[in-house]
Amino acid sequence: MGYGWRPQVRVCVPVPMYHCFGSVLGGMSMAVHGITLVFPCSGYSSRANLEAIQSEKCNFVYGTPTMFADMLSQDLHKYDLSSVEAGIMGGSPCPPAIMRKLITDMNMKEITICYGTTENSPITFMGFPQDTEELKTNTVGCIMSHTEAKVVDPNNGEIVPLGASGELMIRGSCVMHGYWDDPEKTRQAICQARWYRTGDVASLNSLGYCCIEGRIKDMIIRGGENIYPAEIEQFLYTHPKVQEVQVVGVKDERLGEQVCACIRLMEGQTSSAEEIKAFCKGQISHFKMPHYVIFVDSYPLTASGKIKKNLLKEAMEKKLGL
């Protein structure tokens, strides 16, 4: 990705600077290519993004699929987007409908899909601008130069055949040295041979394209933001009426997933979704607040007494009609 090797390129950067998407792909590209970065506003506003593109004549636009969907929901005919040439997208899979609208409605002749984590920053897989729509919507591109990737059986660590699913592992200079002051967590994430365990379920095809299929752990991906259910669960446990709580991600057309809190109340207690949401407001990040609050009597359990979150997720989606 050389931005046409033109230092006069201007990039609209609405993605947060506390993620590698903004801090590394933004700052590094500015340092290496001499491009101009345009920050639409101090927070996030799809309208401010479009105003910045128009006033600053931006050529490239960064964003997650959700950010692009928000921009597409505005009255685009009010803005001059003729300067736009391309988009860089990451954070979560992009629905085909959004991809097509970006090309037709926002003048993005080229759209590049990227994948990476903060631990192997900034990206390890990247698509080609001229990839087919199928490759752009179903894969995250090919492995970057000087980086290795493999998909292994998480149970035994053996490499699985092409096309088969397993845990994606990454090795290269992009992999972090470790988590600050947390050697145990570092050992869990990076093996002795310096392979980083992404925790993602993925597959590689014969052309080297990677398809991300889900999370091994229970992480929720809401609009490109990674949310750990345990963090929300721990907070909700502090509510005096809550006996037990499990948080799962349920399907959402715009954000990919939404946070659903499944709560078992203390005996004799009553509550409401509004009460739980009010309890969360101002105490946890807005994007981590439960969108749905469902009160349950029990949870699906394994023979050993562990909660089957996959079955709980399915039950909640069915109950909510998703």
PLM region spans:
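Acidic/polar alpha-helix N-cap and adjacent early helical turns
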Residues: E314-L322
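Short Gly/Pro-enriched turn/cap motifs at secondary-structure boundaries
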Residues: N138-M144, I159, I190-A193
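Conserved AMP-binding/adenylation subdomain of ANL enzymes
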Residues: M1-R10, Y18-F60, Q74
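AMP-binding/adenylate-forming core of the ANL superfamily
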Residues: K150, L162-M176, W195, V201-A202
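Alpha-helix capping/helix-boundary segments
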Residues: T66-F68, C94, V175
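Gly/Ser/Thr-rich phosphate-binding loop
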Residues: Q8, I35, L50, C58-G63, ...
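Phosphate-coordination loops involved in phosphoryl transfer and adenosine-cofactor binding
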Residues: P7-Q8, V84, Q192, P290
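AMP-binding/adenylate-forming catalytic core of the ANL superfamily
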Residues: V61-T64, G172, H177-D181, K185-Q188, ...
